[in-house]
Amino acid sequence: MIWHVQNENFILDSTRIFMKAFHLLLFDGSLIFPECILIFGLILLLMIDSTSDQKDIPWLYFISSTSLVMSITALLFRWREEPMISFSGNFQTNNFNEIFQFLILLCSTLCIPLSVEYIECTEMAITEFLLFVLTATLGGMFLCGANDLITIFVAPECFSLCSYLLSGYTKKDVRSNEATMKYLLMGGASSSILVHGFSWLYGSSGGEIELQEIVNGLINTQMYNSPGISIALIFITVGIGFKLSPAPSHQWTPDVYEGSPTPVVAFLSVTSKVAASASATRIFDIPFYFSSNEWHLLLEILAILSMILGNLIAITQTSMKRMLAYSSIGQIGYVIIGIIVGDSNDGYASMITYMLFYISMNLGTFACIVLFGLRTGTDNIRDYAGLYTKDPFLALSLALCLLSLGGLPPLAGFFGKLYLFWCGWQAGLYFLVLIGLLTSVVSIYYYLKIIKLLMIGRNQEITPHVRNYRRSPFRSNNSIELSMIVCVIASTIPGISMNPIIAIAQDTLF
């Protein structure tokens, strides 16, 4: 009799849980329609991989790219809709979150054609690679819309686990295995630090997990200026710092950049920063609203260290990917200026604008590196000497992307930095802006040093790698060149038409 009653209770509880889940999916599912498209693409890839003996490779790329483009389209159709909170407060939809989701989808859409020839040359498993990229994209999108501590922790873990697997995708490469191990160990440590900070925030607010409810809880418990909040701030800053990779949380970045497959590095170099920036703005601005002076000071220190160390150490590098790793550390210092300025003085608008340009500049540079690496088998900066004599198009594309990264006019990078520094100056961050200007000049030096190597025309200085340079026989090299052309155009043309881009960025609601 007791067993019968317990069994009935179990069935009733299971039915209630199922009905609640169905209700959430039915009424809130439309708010995550772009994410649902990616999930459908993932399921389709798995079905094709498990049912087909001979994998139709073009179809796999087509399904992945189409799901990303359709997800972008769904986001654009939803633009300007009223902000909504769904899934019992776990997820928030507004223009601010959606523009970061758009940037992540844009990165992934450009990275897939960039990876085609590399995967064919290295004979890596194609389906798993695409699954990891789409799953990481999905995790990044959920992180952008996360509205509670649990989702903010689980979503980046979804992204991070796929990142670890992608960085170690070339299993026979010793450098790749070493990079993966460092990435995994430091990522696990940073996640534990982050969740420890969340526990302090959870306890201080009286057991709240939603971001806005945490603020209300801190007011009710009178804990908004307590030492516990300062401890939470320090731990959370360290945890998020690993994802953004500013100095001194940058130790993993050069090794992962150098050891991982180049298309993977291109993907991680932009998507991780976009997703982490979206999360950082919400965490610092909402739960730590009463500690703005403290987190401003912490971020200013990180920005200064990143801009100085990143650009100075980049000068000494001999590997192109390690140089870009330290360059990215310097670039995140500029982005942090926008986070500090905040919603006032167009800080977030300038950060979003600069990140859009940074995506095109960085991916364009990596597309050139992928092509050069496949045709020569080297990553050494000195081996680029004389590339202009063999492949003027590739050399000019790389030069334009590097000049845009350095911030030379009239390229997009110049206008992005100008807008970002102007907003910082208007907010009174004079010292940060001056450091940013000086380190930008330093970055121009090492970018110009590479461009000078590219344009060498004397035979005695041309390296054997360039002398024996051959175009790839693979049919898919057009896909890399397509990504490269799109990124090069986006790195140059938007600088002339900044106003529409700034207007869209300013239209985001936080």
Swiss-Prot record:
GO cellular component labels: chloroplast thylakoid membrane
Sequence intervals crossing the membrane: 24-44, 57-77, 99-119, 124-144, 149-169, 183-203, 227-247, 295-315, 323-343, 354-374, 395-415, 418-438, 484-504
Superkingdom of the source species: Eukaryota
Catalytic activity: a plastoquinone + NADH + (n+1) H(+)(in) = a plastoquinol + NAD(+) + n H(+)(out); a plastoquinone + NADPH + (n+1) H(+)(in) = a plastoquinol + NADP(+) + n H(+)(out)
Keyword Lyase included in the entry's annotation: no
Principal place of residence: plastid
Family matches, as InterPro entries: NADH-Q_OxRdtase_suN/2, ND/Mrp_TM, Ndh2_N
UniProt subcellular location: Plastid, Chloroplast thylakoid membrane
Subunit structure of this chain's protein: NDH is composed of at least 16 different subunits, 5 of which are encoded in the nucleus.
Name recorded for this polypeptide: NAD(P)H-quinone oxidoreductase subunit 2 A, chloroplastic
Gene symbol of the encoding locus: ndhB-A
